[in-house]
């Protein structure tokens, strides 16, 4: 093990190799060293590098005295236990390394009682390379020394010689075995919850993987649509089924069909036709018969006989009709004894509730086989509607007499001239016609005086307006009546309330409030006085009553006296009743 070793010359390396020889057993198992920073080599598998490394002093500018040497510092005991605890927690399973570390500690701390000399640290160590502390046991034997101890060209050989001179005088304390054992046990006991959680998750994941591995995989069933035929095949099958059904129904109908009699006759005639033809041919061949003349019927030759036959036919029809009427009259059902008999309640309810289950209905609709003539019916309907249509009355002009001929007329100059010229002319003079002023007089009148014909539309319009006005008047009257009725009701309610108050013997709360308040206050005072009086009486009884022990002693004394009295009476041969009767007799005397 080397402490404070720099990247120096071969002398220091040889010295450290002689003091701390490397172990060949640990070199095979321990990994290679890690190199940090500027030539700082730390073994990865060595667990005492933190414990043995002293504090680094990197602040070179703050040293005001300019000293080039310093004393090595020994780590405190508490920091040492923390480092050991962390080291043992990092690898608790390696028993071989733990044994080797214990041996290193024993060999390193065997010089515990020696003093700590003050060794000066050259300045080149502080500025050249960082101080390192590593275990030689953790270094593998096959690694070359040049890789473990890199050389530095910056430092002079005097500095290496000074380091080799004071490195052998360093004393590092060694922990006890009990402390190491307790630290190892504590590391095993103080397992972090994160490790438990990680183990639990790992076990859960492993269980899920095992369940997934044990799961059996099966192929899914073939879907149903794979077995379905194509659309064309479905349609062909449907068409074949339809044709087969049609053929079967046709055969069924033909099997149930019954031929008519004339069809049979026609078939028989067709079958007999060849025979008749052969018979006719044979008759013609044998001998032609003589033509026989048919007799004329008497109805043709004698007209009176035909009339008689018609009368007999008519008489027969009349008799048939009369016989039918008689049979109908005789076949009528007898009159029932109880007419209009009401059905029972159960029957009525059954008819009402179970009418939808009825199969035999009273109403039997009759189908009219004759198709009506809709066009003729529509024309007849239009004709009837035109006849019933209301025709508007036309305006009829009534003649009137104009009295313009009776008005006086003054001749004008033009009329006089015409009259003078007329004397000369051979034409006869015409009678002067007065001018009619009827039109001018009528024009001077107002429009209301003109004779106007009132149509049905105007009459209906006036009636509608009149009805609307009447409705409005009625609604106004109803509103007014409601207002008057409301006012009357309010006045009546006021008068009723006033009369009820006047007739009611009870008084209002405002009138009785003061009297009730006074009465309640007086009752409270009386109750308080009675309560105080009862309290005083109770206190007096308590004060005058003897104590409990006095009552007990008095009762005991009384019982003793009564017992003595009974004993005395028994000794004298007397009874209590005899003595009591005698005492009552003496008191009465």
Swiss-Prot record:
InterPro entries given in the database record: FAM161 (IPR051655), FAM161A/B (IPR019579)
Biased composition (Basic residues): 287-297
Statement: the UniProt record of this protein carries the keyword Coiled coil: yes
Annotated Acidic residues bias: 92-106
Domain of life of the source: Eukaryota
Biased composition (Polar residues): 151-166
Sequence segments annotated as region (Disordered): 1-166, 265-297, 386-444
GO CC term, one of those recorded: cytoplasmic microtubule
Basic and acidic residues: bias regions: 265-275, 386-396
The keyword Coiled coil appears for this protein: yes
PANTHER family in the cross-refs: PROTEIN FAM-161, PROTEIN FAM161B
Assembly, per entry: Interacts with FAM161A.
Name listed for the protein in its UniProt record: Protein FAM161B
Organism: Mus musculus
């Amino acid at each position: 093990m080397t402490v404070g070793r720099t990247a120096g010359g071969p002398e220091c390396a040889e010295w450290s190799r002689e003091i701390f020889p490397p172990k060949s057993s640990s070199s095979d198992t321990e990994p290679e060293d890690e190199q940090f920073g500027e030539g700082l080599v730390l073994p990865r598998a060595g667990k005492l590098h933190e414990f043995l490394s002293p504090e680094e002093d990197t602040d070179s500018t703050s040293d005001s005295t300019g000293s080039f040497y310093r004393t090595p510092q020994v780590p405190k005991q508490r920091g040492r236990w923390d480092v050991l605890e962390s080291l043992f927690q990092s690898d608790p399973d390696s028993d071989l390394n733990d044994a080797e570390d214990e041996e290193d500690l024993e060999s390193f701390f065997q010089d515990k009682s020696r003093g700590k000399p003050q060794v000066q640290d050259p300045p080149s160590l502080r500025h050249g390379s960082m101080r390192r502390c590593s275990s030689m046991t953790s270094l593998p034997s096959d690694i070359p020394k040049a890789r473990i101890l890199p050389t530095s060209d910056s430092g002079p050989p005097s500095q290496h010689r000074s380091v080799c001179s004071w490195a052998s005088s360093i004393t590092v304390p060694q922990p006890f075995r009990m402390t190491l054992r307790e630290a190892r046990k504590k590391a095993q006991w103080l397992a972090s919850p994160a490790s438990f959680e990680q183990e639990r998750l790992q076990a859960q994941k492993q269980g899920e993987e095992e369940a997934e591995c044990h799961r059996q995989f099966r192929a899914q069933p073939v879907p149903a649509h794979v077995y379905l035929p194509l659309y064309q095949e479905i349609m062909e099958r449907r068409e074949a089924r339809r044709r087969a059904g049609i053929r079967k129904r046709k055969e069924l109908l033909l099997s149930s069909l019954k031929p008519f009699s004339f069809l049979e006759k026609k078939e028989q005639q067709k079958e007999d036709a060849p025979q008749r033809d052969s018979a006719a041919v044979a008759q013609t061949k044998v001998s032609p018969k003589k033509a026989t003349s048919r007799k004329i019927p008497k109805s043709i030759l004698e007209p009176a006989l035909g009339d008689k036959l018609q009368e007999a036919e008519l008489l027969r029809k009349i008799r048939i009709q009369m016989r039918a009427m008689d049979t109908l009259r005789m076949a009528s059902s007898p009159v029932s004894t109880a007419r209009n008999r009401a059905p029972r309640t159960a029957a009525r309810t059954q008819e009402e509730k179970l009418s939808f289950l009825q199969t035999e209905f009273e109403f039997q609709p009759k189908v009219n086989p004759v198709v009506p003539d809709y066009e003729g019916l529509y024309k007849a309907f239009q004709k009837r509607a035109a006849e019933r249509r209301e025709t508007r009355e036309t305006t009829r002009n009534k003649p009137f007499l104009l009295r313009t001929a009776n008005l006086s007329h003054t001749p004008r100059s033009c009329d006089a001239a015409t009259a003078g010229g007329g004397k000369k002319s051979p034409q006869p003079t015409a009678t002067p016609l007065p001018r009619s002023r009827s039109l001018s007089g009528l024009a001077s009148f107002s429009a209301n005086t003109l004779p106007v014909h009132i149509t049905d539309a105007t009459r209906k319009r006036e009636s509608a307006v009149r009805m609307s006005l009447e409705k409005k008047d009625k609604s106004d009257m109803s509103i007014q009546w409601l207002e008057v009725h409301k006012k009357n009701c309010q006045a009546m309610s006021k008068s009723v309330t006033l009369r009820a108050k006047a007739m009611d013997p009870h008084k209002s709360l405002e009138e009785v409030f003061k009297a009730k308040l006074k009465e309640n206050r007086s009752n409270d005072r009386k109750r308080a006085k009675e309560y105080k009086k009862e309290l005083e009486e109770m206190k007096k009884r308590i004060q005058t009553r003897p104590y409990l022990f006095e009552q007990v002693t008095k009762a005991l004394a009384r019982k003793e006296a009564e017992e003595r009295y009974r004993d005395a009476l028994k000794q004298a041969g007397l009874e209590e009743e005899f003595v009591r009767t005698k005492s009552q007799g003496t008191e009465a005397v």
